[in-house]
């Protein structure tokens, strides 16, 4: 459960990164594909080379969904309901991949905003990413 300070911390992080959705999203995906190559199996039709338009486009969607969840932090489930349906019923993404993506996103935030990512903010962002992952996997049950 996200506390009031967690919510404030998360909103503060996303206020800093909102204008960089495409870049940070692409970097997150590239990092995930390199670190966890098994995640590439969900993107057989993508050009997975650094800087590809497909990676940038999907990265922008990923970070856009995180921004949407942060903007509706009191009801993440409602804000990501359609995305949850898509990933569970159509794409059938292995739920562990949401955790892997979250870890890579944390690294990207740390690289670009080291002074923002204090231990407290890191913990809040991690809790938020876990909450997002839980919402995205809720319809698997």
UniProtKB/Swiss-Prot annotation:
BP terms from Gene Ontology: hydrogen peroxide catabolic process
Residues where O2 binds: 58
Listed GO CC annotations: blood microparticle; haptoglobin-hemoglobin complex; hemoglobin complex
Keywords assigned by UniProt, alphabetized: Heme, Iron, Metal-binding, Oxygen transport, Transport
Ligand binding (heme b): 87
InterPro entries: Globin, Globin-like_sf, Globin/Proto, Hemoglobin_a-typ, Hemoglobin_oxygen_transport, Hemoglobin_pi
Tissue: Red blood cells.
Gene Ontology MF, one: peroxidase activity
Domain Globin positions: 1-141
SUPFAM superfamilies tied to this protein: Globin-like
Quaternary structure annotation from Swiss-Prot or TrEMBL: Heterotetramer of two alpha chains and two beta chains.
Protein role: Involved in oxygen transport from the lung to the various peripheral tissues.
Family per record: Belongs to the globin family.
Descriptive protein name: Hemoglobin subunit alpha-A
